[in-house]
Amino acid sequence: YFDAIEITECTDDEERNAVKKILEQSHMKVCYGAQPRLLGPKLNPNDIDEKGRKAAENTLLEAIDEAEYLGAKGIAFLAGKWEEKTKEQAYEQLLKTTRNLCDYAAKKDMMVELEVFDFDMDKAALIGPAPYAAKFAADMRTTHNNFGLLVDLSHFPTTYETSKFVIQILKPYITHLHFGNAVVKKGCQAYGDKHPRMGYPESANDVKELVEYLTVLKEENFFNSEEPLVLSMEVTLIGDEDEEIVLANTKRVLNRAWALVED
C-alpha cells in the first residue's frame, strides 16, 4: 500500500543502522521529517537571538547528514514561534537559516522543505498562512532551487484557509504533500494541531474534504506518474485508540476519496 515513508531522528547508531538496512531492502521513497528535532528541544530557526538560531541550524544540518545516510533526498522542517514586534527580524533570521541549509544540502543534491503551519492556534509558527508562505518561498527561490514547501490538509482549518486557496497560491513552490485532520473548535477534545483520525468528533476533515484536496491537486496538474510527489498520511492516536484500526480508517478514507475524484 505504501510507496513512501517519513522518518525522523534515530536514537543511536544501532537503531540508525537497523533502519538503514530495512529501508535499503524496501523499495520505498524515503523522506526525513526534522520537525521533532526542533519541537522537542524547543529550538527556533527564526530565533532573533543568534545563539538560539544557530542551535536550530546546527541540528538541522545534522538532520541533513542523517537523512542522507538513511537514503532520503532531503529534509522537512518548520518555522518557530514569533512575536508581532519582531516579525520582520524573525523573517530575516529564517531566511538566513534556510539559505544555509540549502547551501549545505545542495552539495549533496538534496532538498530542503519548509512545512506550512498555523500562525496563531497551536504551533503558532512564523510561516503560514499561505500568502506569507508564498512570499517566503519566492524569496528563497531567488537564491536556491533546492527549496520547496510542504503543505498539509490538516493545517488548512488551523489557518482558516481552503484547499483551493492554499494550493493555487503556493502552486509554484509545493514539493511535498500531507493529509490529515484537525479539531478547530475550542474546548473540544484534540483541539489544535493534534492530527486525530479522519472523521474524529467535531473535527474539520473527512472524506469530503479529502476529495476537495485531491480534486484541486488534480486540477492544478500535481499528479505526475513519471515523477510523483509524496502524499503522506499524518494521523495520530487519541486516548486509547488502536493504531491498526486508525491506520485502516485512514486507508479507507483515502481509498473512498480517491474513488470519488472525477476523471
Regions found by a protein language model. Give the residues of each.
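Short, glycine/charged-enriched secondary-structure capping and boundary segments
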Residues: 19-23, 46, 89-92, 127-129, ...
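A short small-residue
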Residues: 39-44, 74-82, 192-194, 232-234
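Hydrophobic faces of well-ordered beta-strands that scaffold small-molecule active sites
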Residues: 3-7, 30-35, 75-77, 112-114, ...
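Acidic-and-aromatic substrate-binding clefts and catalytic sites of carbohydrate-active enzymes
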Residues: 4-18, 83-85, 120-127, 153-161, ...
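N-terminal pre-domain/capping segments
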Residues: 1-62, 68, 144-146, 248-263
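Short amphipathic alpha-helices and their capping/turn segments at secondary-structure boundaries
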Residues: 11-30, 59-69, 95-106, 162-175, ...
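Active-site acidic/histidine proton-transfer and metal-coordination neighborhood
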Residues: 46-148
